[in-house]
Protein backbone atom coordinates (compact mmCIF):
# COMPACT_ATOMS: atom_id res chain seq x y z
CA UNK A 1 0.00 0.00 0.00
CA UNK A 2 2.83 2.41 0.74
CA UNK A 3 4.84 3.58 -2.20
CA UNK A 4 7.43 6.25 -3.03
CA UNK A 5 9.64 5.24 -0.10
CA UNK A 6 13.28 6.12 -0.64
CA UNK A 7 15.01 4.04 2.04
CA UNK A 8 14.04 0.43 2.66
CA UNK A 9 15.61 -2.11 4.95
CA UNK A 10 15.63 -5.76 5.85
CA UNK A 11 14.45 -5.71 9.48
CA UNK A 12 17.23 -6.62 11.91
CA UNK A 13 14.67 -7.84 14.42
CA UNK A 14 12.69 -10.25 12.30
CA UNK A 15 9.38 -11.83 13.10
CA UNK A 16 10.99 -15.20 13.78
CA UNK A 17 13.33 -14.08 16.56
CA UNK A 18 13.01 -14.01 20.35
CA UNK A 19 14.50 -11.39 22.62
CA UNK A 20 16.67 -12.10 25.65
CA UNK A 21 13.63 -12.09 27.91
CA UNK A 22 12.00 -14.80 25.82
CA UNK A 23 9.64 -12.54 23.87
CA UNK A 24 7.23 -14.82 22.02
CA UNK A 25 8.02 -15.25 18.36
CA UNK A 26 5.70 -13.80 15.74
CA UNK A 27 4.99 -15.60 12.46
CA UNK A 28 6.67 -14.19 9.38
CA UNK A 29 4.20 -12.03 7.45
CA UNK A 30 2.89 -13.31 4.13
CA UNK A 31 3.73 -11.60 0.85
CA UNK A 32 0.19 -10.27 0.45
CA UNK A 33 -2.62 -9.13 2.69
CA UNK A 34 -6.21 -7.92 2.73
CA UNK A 35 -6.77 -4.17 2.64
CA UNK A 36 -9.71 -1.82 2.22
CA UNK A 37 -8.97 0.60 -0.61
CA UNK A 38 -10.67 2.98 -3.01
CA UNK A 39 -9.71 4.18 -6.49
CA UNK A 40 -11.60 7.46 -6.78
CA UNK A 41 -13.33 9.59 -4.14
CA UNK A 42 -17.03 9.09 -3.61
CA UNK A 43 -19.70 7.69 -1.33
CA UNK A 44 -19.07 4.75 0.99
CA UNK A 45 -19.75 2.35 -1.86
CA UNK A 46 -16.38 3.14 -3.46
CA UNK A 47 -14.64 1.14 -0.71
CA UNK A 48 -13.57 -2.35 -1.68
CA UNK A 49 -11.49 -5.16 -0.26
CA UNK A 50 -8.35 -5.96 -2.27
CA UNK A 51 -5.30 -8.19 -2.01
CA UNK A 52 -2.15 -6.08 -1.94
CA UNK A 53 1.53 -6.54 -1.01
CA UNK A 54 2.43 -6.35 2.65
CA UNK A 55 4.12 -2.94 3.06
CA UNK A 56 7.86 -2.59 3.66
CA UNK A 57 8.90 -0.26 6.48
CA UNK A 58 11.64 2.35 6.27
CA UNK A 59 14.28 2.84 8.94
CA UNK A 60 12.05 4.87 11.23
CA UNK A 61 9.08 2.50 11.11
CA UNK A 62 7.71 -0.71 12.58
CA UNK A 63 5.73 -3.36 10.75
CA UNK A 64 2.69 -4.33 12.81
CA UNK A 65 -0.01 -6.94 12.42
CA UNK A 66 -3.26 -5.03 12.78
CA UNK A 67 -5.83 -6.64 15.04
CA UNK A 68 -8.29 -3.73 15.11
CA UNK A 69 -8.52 -0.33 13.43
CA UNK A 70 -10.36 2.77 14.55
CA UNK A 71 -12.85 4.46 12.21
CA UNK A 72 -12.86 8.25 12.36
CA UNK A 73 -14.79 11.04 10.63
CA UNK A 74 -11.57 12.05 8.84
CA UNK A 75 -11.60 8.64 7.13
CA UNK A 76 -15.02 9.21 5.63
CA UNK A 77 -14.18 12.79 4.64
CA UNK A 78 -10.97 11.64 2.96
CA UNK A 79 -12.77 8.88 1.10
CA UNK A 80 -15.25 11.47 -0.20
CA UNK A 81 -12.45 13.67 -1.57
CA UNK A 82 -12.22 16.10 1.35
CA UNK A 83 -10.32 15.61 4.61
CA UNK A 84 -6.70 14.78 3.81
CA UNK A 85 -7.43 13.35 0.37
CA UNK A 86 -5.03 15.82 -1.23
CA UNK A 87 -2.14 14.37 0.78
CA UNK A 88 -2.62 10.83 -0.55
CA UNK A 89 -0.32 9.61 -3.30
CA UNK A 90 -0.74 5.84 -3.39
CA UNK A 91 -3.06 4.19 -5.88
CA UNK A 92 -5.36 2.59 -4.95
CA UNK A 93 -5.81 4.75 -1.88
CA UNK A 94 -5.72 3.22 1.58
CA UNK A 95 -7.52 4.38 4.71
CA UNK A 96 -7.19 4.17 8.47
CA UNK A 97 -5.00 6.19 10.82
CA UNK A 98 -5.24 4.36 14.13
CA UNK A 99 -4.84 0.76 15.18
CA UNK A 100 -4.04 -1.78 17.84
CA UNK A 101 -1.92 -4.79 17.05
CA UNK A 102 1.34 -6.68 17.45
CA UNK A 103 4.85 -5.68 16.38
CA UNK A 104 6.15 -7.94 13.60
CA UNK A 105 9.52 -6.33 12.84
CA UNK A 106 11.69 -3.49 14.09
CA UNK A 107 14.43 -1.44 12.39
CA UNK A 108 17.24 -2.38 14.78
CA UNK A 109 18.32 -4.73 17.58
CA UNK A 110 17.32 -3.97 21.18
CA UNK A 111 14.32 -1.94 20.07
CA UNK A 112 12.12 -0.97 23.05
CA UNK A 113 9.10 -2.47 21.26
CA UNK A 114 10.42 -5.88 20.10
CA UNK A 115 8.50 -8.33 17.90
CA UNK A 116 5.52 -9.72 19.76
CA UNK A 117 4.84 -6.52 21.72
CA UNK A 118 1.21 -5.44 21.78
CA UNK A 119 1.03 -1.81 20.71
CA UNK A 120 -1.45 0.88 19.73
CA UNK A 121 -0.89 4.05 17.79
CA UNK A 122 -1.20 5.88 14.51
CA UNK A 123 0.06 5.56 10.98
CA UNK A 124 1.87 8.54 9.42
CA UNK A 125 -0.79 11.26 9.53
CA UNK A 126 -1.88 12.66 7.14
CA UNK A 127 0.06 11.30 4.18
CA UNK A 128 0.11 7.54 4.81
CA UNK A 129 -3.01 5.91 6.20
CA UNK A 130 -3.28 2.15 6.01
CA UNK A 131 -4.65 0.56 9.18
CA UNK A 132 -7.69 -0.86 7.35
CA UNK A 133 -5.49 -3.85 6.51
CA UNK A 134 -3.90 -6.99 7.94
CA UNK A 135 -0.51 -5.25 8.27
CA UNK A 136 0.62 -1.64 8.46
CA UNK A 137 3.87 0.30 8.66
CA UNK A 138 3.85 2.87 11.44
CA UNK A 139 6.31 5.50 12.68
CA UNK A 140 8.21 4.28 15.73
CA UNK A 141 7.51 7.56 17.53
CA UNK A 142 3.75 7.29 16.95
CA UNK A 143 3.13 4.10 18.93
CA UNK A 144 3.18 2.91 22.54
CA UNK A 145 2.51 -0.29 24.43
CA UNK A 146 -1.17 -1.17 24.42
CA UNK A 147 -2.97 -0.47 27.70
CA UNK A 148 -3.04 -3.78 29.53
CA UNK A 149 -6.61 -3.22 30.73
CA UNK A 150 -7.99 -2.81 27.20
CA UNK A 151 -8.80 -5.29 24.47
CA UNK A 152 -7.35 -4.62 21.03
CA UNK A 153 -10.77 -3.41 19.85
CA UNK A 154 -10.92 -0.91 22.71
CA UNK A 155 -7.31 0.18 22.24
CA UNK A 156 -7.84 0.81 18.52
CA UNK A 157 -10.54 3.33 19.44
CA UNK A 158 -8.09 5.46 21.39
CA UNK A 159 -5.16 6.95 19.40
CA UNK A 160 -6.47 9.58 16.98
CA UNK A 161 -9.44 10.65 19.11
CA UNK A 162 -7.61 10.71 22.44
CA UNK A 163 -4.50 12.39 21.03
CA UNK A 164 -6.75 15.06 19.52
CA UNK A 165 -8.53 15.52 22.84
CA UNK A 166 -5.20 15.74 24.68
CA UNK A 167 -3.99 18.39 22.25
CA UNK A 168 -7.17 20.38 22.71
CA UNK A 169 -7.57 20.11 26.46
CA UNK A 170 -4.01 19.88 27.76
CA UNK A 171 -1.73 21.48 25.19
CA UNK A 172 -4.04 24.22 23.90
CA UNK A 173 -6.64 24.99 26.58
CA UNK A 174 -4.26 24.16 29.47
CA UNK A 175 -7.18 22.84 31.49
CA UNK A 176 -6.94 23.59 35.19
CA UNK A 177 -8.97 23.92 38.35
CA UNK A 178 -11.44 26.79 38.26
CA UNK A 179 -11.55 26.98 34.47
CA UNK A 180 -14.94 26.68 32.75
CA UNK A 181 -14.83 24.73 29.48
CA UNK A 182 -17.70 24.27 27.02
CA UNK A 183 -17.31 21.18 24.82
CA UNK A 184 -19.61 20.71 21.84
CA UNK A 185 -20.42 17.16 20.72
CA UNK A 186 -19.18 15.72 23.99
CA UNK A 187 -20.48 12.26 23.21
CA UNK A 188 -18.43 11.63 20.07
CA UNK A 189 -15.04 10.02 19.64
CA UNK A 190 -12.95 13.10 20.43
CA UNK A 191 -15.61 14.63 22.64
CA UNK A 192 -15.90 11.83 25.18
CA UNK A 193 -12.14 11.91 25.75
CA UNK A 194 -12.12 15.72 25.95
CA UNK A 195 -14.84 15.73 28.61
CA UNK A 196 -12.92 13.23 30.73
CA UNK A 197 -9.53 14.91 30.37
CA UNK A 198 -10.85 18.39 31.13
CA UNK A 199 -12.59 17.04 34.22
CA UNK A 200 -9.48 15.08 35.26
CA UNK A 201 -7.38 18.24 35.19
CA UNK A 202 -9.88 20.11 37.33
CA UNK A 203 -11.92 22.18 34.89
CA UNK A 204 -15.67 22.59 35.19
CA UNK A 205 -17.03 20.95 32.05
CA UNK A 206 -20.20 21.94 30.23
CA UNK A 207 -21.01 19.50 27.42
CA UNK A 208 -23.58 19.54 24.64
CA UNK A 209 -24.96 16.33 23.20
CA UNK A 210 -28.08 14.42 22.31
CA UNK A 211 -30.74 13.82 24.96
CA UNK A 212 -29.90 10.12 25.19
CA UNK A 213 -26.24 10.90 25.90
CA UNK A 214 -26.76 13.42 28.70
CA UNK A 215 -26.69 10.95 31.64
CA UNK A 216 -23.58 9.34 30.16
CA UNK A 217 -21.87 12.71 29.77
CA UNK A 218 -22.44 13.34 33.47
CA UNK A 219 -20.81 9.99 34.22
CA UNK A 220 -17.79 11.08 32.17
CA UNK A 221 -17.34 14.19 34.30
CA UNK A 222 -19.49 16.96 32.82
CA UNK A 223 -21.08 19.05 35.56
CA UNK A 224 -23.55 20.69 33.16
CA UNK A 225 -25.08 18.86 30.19
CA UNK A 226 -27.21 20.41 27.46
CA UNK A 227 -29.48 18.78 24.90
CA UNK A 228 -28.56 20.68 21.75
CA UNK A 229 -31.89 19.80 20.11
CA UNK A 230 -34.10 21.37 22.78
CA UNK A 231 -31.95 24.04 24.43
CA UNK A 232 -29.85 26.86 23.06
CA UNK A 233 -26.65 26.51 25.02
CA UNK A 234 -26.00 30.28 25.14
CA UNK A 235 -29.19 30.68 27.19
CA UNK A 236 -27.92 28.53 30.06
CA UNK A 237 -24.12 28.28 30.20
CA UNK A 238 -23.24 31.78 31.36
CA UNK A 239 -19.65 32.82 30.65
CA UNK A 240 -16.90 30.30 29.90
CA UNK A 241 -13.13 30.53 29.56
CA UNK A 242 -12.73 28.05 26.71
CA UNK A 243 -14.92 26.59 23.97
CA UNK A 244 -13.83 23.34 22.33
CA UNK A 245 -15.95 23.20 19.20
CA UNK A 246 -16.14 19.86 17.39
CA UNK A 247 -19.01 21.06 15.18
CA UNK A 248 -18.27 24.54 13.80
CA UNK A 249 -20.91 26.26 11.71
CA UNK A 250 -22.02 23.11 9.93
CA UNK A 251 -25.00 22.83 12.28
CA UNK A 252 -27.12 25.75 13.47
CA UNK A 253 -24.25 28.29 13.54
CA UNK A 254 -22.78 26.61 16.61
CA UNK A 255 -19.43 28.32 16.09
CA UNK A 256 -20.80 31.84 15.81
CA UNK A 257 -23.04 31.35 18.83
CA UNK A 258 -20.12 29.99 20.85
CA UNK A 259 -18.23 33.27 20.62
CA UNK A 260 -20.99 35.02 22.56
CA UNK A 261 -20.45 32.92 25.70
CA UNK A 262 -16.70 33.43 25.94
CA UNK A 263 -15.30 35.92 28.43
CA UNK A 264 -13.26 38.77 26.88
CA UNK A 265 -9.99 37.26 25.81
CA UNK A 266 -11.38 33.74 26.16
CA UNK A 267 -10.25 30.96 23.84
CA UNK A 268 -12.21 29.35 21.01
CA UNK A 269 -10.71 26.12 19.61
CA UNK A 270 -12.12 24.65 16.41
CA UNK A 271 -11.90 21.11 15.06
CA UNK A 272 -12.15 20.72 12.11
CA UNK A 273 -11.26 24.01 10.47
CA UNK A 274 -13.28 23.18 7.36
CA UNK A 275 -16.43 23.41 9.43
CA UNK A 276 -16.07 27.20 9.65
CA UNK A 277 -13.48 28.85 7.40
CA UNK A 278 -14.15 32.34 8.77
CA UNK A 279 -13.73 31.52 12.45
CA UNK A 280 -10.57 33.57 13.04
CA UNK A 281 -11.99 36.85 11.74
CA UNK A 282 -15.24 36.33 13.63
CA UNK A 283 -13.37 35.67 16.86
CA UNK A 284 -11.23 38.78 16.47
CA UNK A 285 -14.35 40.87 15.94
CA UNK A 286 -15.85 39.37 19.11
CA UNK A 287 -12.79 40.20 21.21
CA UNK A 288 -11.75 36.61 21.88
CA UNK A 289 -8.82 34.45 20.87
CA UNK A 290 -9.20 31.62 18.38
CA UNK A 291 -7.17 28.74 17.09
CA UNK A 292 -7.62 25.37 15.44
CA UNK A 293 -6.03 22.03 16.17
CA UNK A 294 -4.89 19.07 14.07
CA UNK A 295 -3.79 15.83 15.68
CA UNK A 296 -0.08 15.14 16.12
CA UNK A 297 0.84 11.44 16.48
CA UNK A 298 2.94 11.15 19.64
CA UNK A 299 3.96 7.91 21.30
CA UNK A 300 4.94 9.59 24.56
CA UNK A 301 1.46 11.08 24.95
CA UNK A 302 -0.04 7.70 24.05
CA UNK A 303 2.00 6.16 26.85
CA UNK A 304 0.56 8.73 29.26
CA UNK A 305 -2.95 8.02 28.00
CA UNK A 306 -2.31 4.29 28.43
CA UNK A 307 -1.48 4.87 32.09
CA UNK A 308 -4.65 6.89 32.57
CA UNK A 309 -6.70 4.17 30.89
CA UNK A 310 -5.09 1.39 32.90
CA UNK A 311 -5.70 3.27 36.15
CA UNK A 312 -9.35 3.93 35.28
CA UNK A 313 -8.88 7.70 35.35
CA UNK A 314 -10.33 7.82 31.84
CA UNK A 315 -12.11 5.20 29.75
CA UNK A 316 -12.92 4.53 26.14
CA UNK A 317 -16.37 3.72 24.79
CA UNK A 318 -16.80 1.63 21.64
CA UNK A 319 -20.22 2.11 20.08
CA UNK A 320 -20.07 -0.51 17.33
CA UNK A 321 -17.65 -3.05 15.91
CA UNK A 322 -17.61 -4.12 12.25
CA UNK A 323 -15.51 -6.73 10.48
CA UNK A 324 -12.87 -5.43 8.08
CA UNK A 325 -15.01 -6.48 5.11
CA UNK A 326 -17.82 -4.29 6.49
CA UNK A 327 -15.87 -1.03 6.18
CA UNK A 328 -18.52 0.39 3.86
CA UNK A 329 -21.20 -0.12 6.53
CA UNK A 330 -18.92 1.41 9.17
CA UNK A 331 -18.48 4.51 7.01
CA UNK A 332 -22.21 4.83 6.46
CA UNK A 333 -22.72 4.62 10.22
CA UNK A 334 -20.15 7.28 11.08
CA UNK A 335 -21.56 9.60 8.41
CA UNK A 336 -25.00 9.33 10.01
CA UNK A 337 -23.55 10.99 13.09
CA UNK A 338 -24.76 10.72 16.69
CA UNK A 339 -22.23 8.00 17.48
CA UNK A 340 -21.52 7.46 21.17
CA UNK A 341 -17.77 7.08 21.44
CA UNK A 342 -16.02 5.23 18.62
CA UNK A 343 -16.59 2.79 15.76
CA UNK A 344 -13.95 0.09 15.26
CA UNK A 345 -13.07 -2.45 12.57
CA UNK A 346 -12.11 -5.91 13.79
CA UNK A 347 -9.31 -6.97 11.44
CA UNK A 348 -8.07 -10.27 12.87
CA UNK A 349 -8.23 -12.49 15.93
CA UNK A 350 -5.58 -12.13 18.61
Can you annotate each of these PLM segments?
Residues 88, 122-185:
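NAD(P)H dinucleotide-binding glycine-rich loop of Rossmann-like/cofactor-binding domains
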Residues 249-314, 346-350:
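Glycine-rich phosphate-binding loop and adjacent beta-alpha segment
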Residues 53-71, 83-125:
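Glycine-rich beta-strand-centered segment in the early N-terminal region that forms part
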Residues 235-242:
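A short acidic, Gly/Pro-enriched loop at the edge of an enzyme's catalytic core
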Residues 159-227:
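Mid-domain Rossmann-like dinucleotide-binding core that forms the NAD(H)/NADP(H) cofactor-binding site
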Residues 4-23, 28-31, 301-350:
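C-terminal hydrophobic helical "lid"/dimerization subdomain
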Residues 9-10, 17-29, 40-67, 90-94, ...:
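A short N-terminal beta-strand-loop micro-motif at the entrance of redox/enzyme domains
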Amino acid sequence: MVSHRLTRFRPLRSASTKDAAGQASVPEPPAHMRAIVFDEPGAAGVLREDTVPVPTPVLSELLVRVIAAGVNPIDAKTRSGAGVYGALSDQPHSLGFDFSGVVVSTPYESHPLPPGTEVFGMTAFPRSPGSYADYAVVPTLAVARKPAALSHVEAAAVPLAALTAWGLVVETAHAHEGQRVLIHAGGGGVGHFAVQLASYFGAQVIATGSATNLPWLRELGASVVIDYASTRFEDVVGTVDVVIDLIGNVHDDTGTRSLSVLRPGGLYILVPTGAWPGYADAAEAAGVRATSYKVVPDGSVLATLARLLDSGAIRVFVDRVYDLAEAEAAHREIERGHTRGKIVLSVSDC
